[in-house]
């Protein structure tokens, strides 16, 4: 049976050809290799039509133009040559579109990303809607790749090399007005007139490319270009620590095209695309993409979720304010905050105001939309307005009696169907639900700070939580724009449990004489966004170390931290960034300066700060403990799958995405190698490095956690 066409041609009475893109049976338009023959057949008809005046590409999907190329195509390539051929096929197709003798216009509504933007760049003009769903970008770098269908060559010539490099190197997505300002699109119109406006543009001569700004013209010359690539190369190397080969290749390919001409540029682009597709970094990043897509589809349980019409929040602190913001402004749900202190409510409201006002200032949001979203948030010092809330999120202090009291109050003041979700980071959910009259409606919903930025949430059912409560809480987390993983109700849950030994080991190395900045730099070089000591300063030393006794009580001495160090630091009133006193020095607010370690830290912990370990040795000690604990969590069914374990670590603590998560990283090293490293470390530093039983068994049998493909588990 012949596949239904994703591209259909309709020539209007005014001799404008409208090519409608609608991939059958899919919510999103993505480009597949097999569509090339369909497009070529249409191009042949267009060339033969001597009456033709212009061509318009438009999508039939309600919220996307083309979301990119189908990533599975890359996974199907076995060699760099096959992936290179895929890129050349894309380049050729775009060249044929560009070579049409009449004006070709892309009418863009919704996401226009990756191969979708490359198709739009091959057109002679672009028009897009002013809808918030409309975004344009080349996100291939986030998959360890570069744009392979001409994007590295066309974009710099259209909008200037420095602006294009920023887009391609970061995967940054532009809104309609930004795209217009930069010259990426020729006009922005309401969705209702998009097609007609594009048709009118197609009836005119080809849109002439607007002159580049003076700065971009200077940077396009040999001297300016040399300076630009040197500066951008340095900045990129600092940011990626050399862990992402795609960024280096992007710079190389763009420079080749500008220095040697487009023909050499296209050759370099296709070759680099093929080689990058085979790198372990790209394979790991693609695996994270597939895993996060799967997690977002996972309902959490087999039961249907209950309706969600409104939410309540207990506690107007930093977490409560952040949760209120994502509930109202991302999920679009009315939210009511209860705090015993009116000041707490004011803080929570101000938090949302600050977030939204920032968007208004950056012109990402209209003032009227800011006001509409803020109107969804209200506050109270009692339970008025809570009677019919579907779900209550508790974000009060980490105190078991207080949280149990909150459960009792919610059961007394809210409806019989109301779910109680605790944002605890360390207390067992079963204990919080111990005196509940409806324990099946009590669950953990653990957000990470800052709430609006951290993509992960842990959903923690206790033994008596109902399947519907799980499904409803997962549904809310997704509405809030989060990636939820369901974890078992054991001390530390998953993320904090694997993070604690990593941070403990960093503190232990401090006591051995390693310097703060050396430890942090070693882990940043390894691929973490910040080092463990800086992370402790950011989350709060008091908050970050509070969980250690809980974990030590549950799992034994492998979780013990050098107690004298922690107490010495806390007794010196050092809580980190929040009180301006931590391991690092904090200047006046608003001043940006390079982080400096507070030299008073070393006498406080009784060392000179004269370390002996190399950066790889420092990283090895911290990371191996994290890997070992992640495997224990899988063994104890704290996480449901290695997929959830990898996603939890990457999205929850910034485990290096180019390594694919703890389980994929163990696979890349081999279980045998991990066991050998840990046994060596156990001999040197003690029994906390003893590899867990499952790793030892896997090393004997030569097993791995993942199969070879990006999405399959063993």
UniProtKB/Swiss-Prot annotation:
GO biological process: one example: fatty acid beta-oxidation
UniProt-listed SUPFAM superfamilies: 6-phosphogluconate dehydrogenase C-terminal domain-like, ClpP/crotonase, NAD(P)-binding Rossmann-fold domains
InterPro entries membership: 3-OHacyl-CoA_DH_CS (IPR006180), 3-OHacyl-CoA_DH_NAD-bd (IPR006176), 3HC_DH_C (IPR006108), 6-PGluconate_DH-like_C_sf (IPR008927), ClpP/crotonase-like_dom_sf (IPR029045), Enoyl-CoA_hydra/iso (IPR001753), FA_oxidation_alpha_subunit (IPR050136), FadJ (IPR012802)
PROSITE patterns with a match to the protein in the record: 3HCDH
Entry annotated with the keyword Ribosomal protein: no
Site (Important for catalytic activity): 118, 140
Annotated GO CC locations: cytoplasm
EC annotation from Swiss-Prot or TrEMBL: 4.2.1.17, 5.1.2.3, 1.1.1.35
Family matches, as Gene3D superfamilies: 1.10.1040.50, 2-enoyl-CoA Hydratase, Chain A, domain 1 (3.90.226.10), NAD(P)-binding Rossmann-like Domain (3.40.50.720)
Residue ranges of the region described as 3-hydroxyacyl-CoA dehydrogenase: 306-714
Chain intervals for the UniProt region annotation (Enoyl-CoA hydratase): 1-190
Subcellular location per the Swiss-Prot or TrEMBL entry: Cytoplasm
CDD domains found in the cross-reference section: crotonase-like
Pathway: Lipid metabolism; fatty acid beta-oxidation
Keywords from the UniProt entry: Cytoplasm, Fatty acid metabolism, Isomerase, Lipid degradation, Lipid metabolism, Lyase, Multifunctional enzyme, NAD, Oxidoreductase
Role, per record: Catalyzes the formation of a hydroxyacyl-CoA by addition of water on enoyl-CoA. Also exhibits 3-hydroxyacyl-CoA epimerase and 3-hydroxyacyl-CoA dehydrogenase activities.
Assigned protein family: In the N-terminal section; belongs to the enoyl-CoA hydratase/isomerase family. In the central section; belongs to the 3-hydroxyacyl-CoA dehydrogenase family.
Subunit structure, interactors included: Heterotetramer of two alpha chains (FadJ) and two beta chains (FadI).
Protein name: Fatty acid oxidation complex subunit alpha
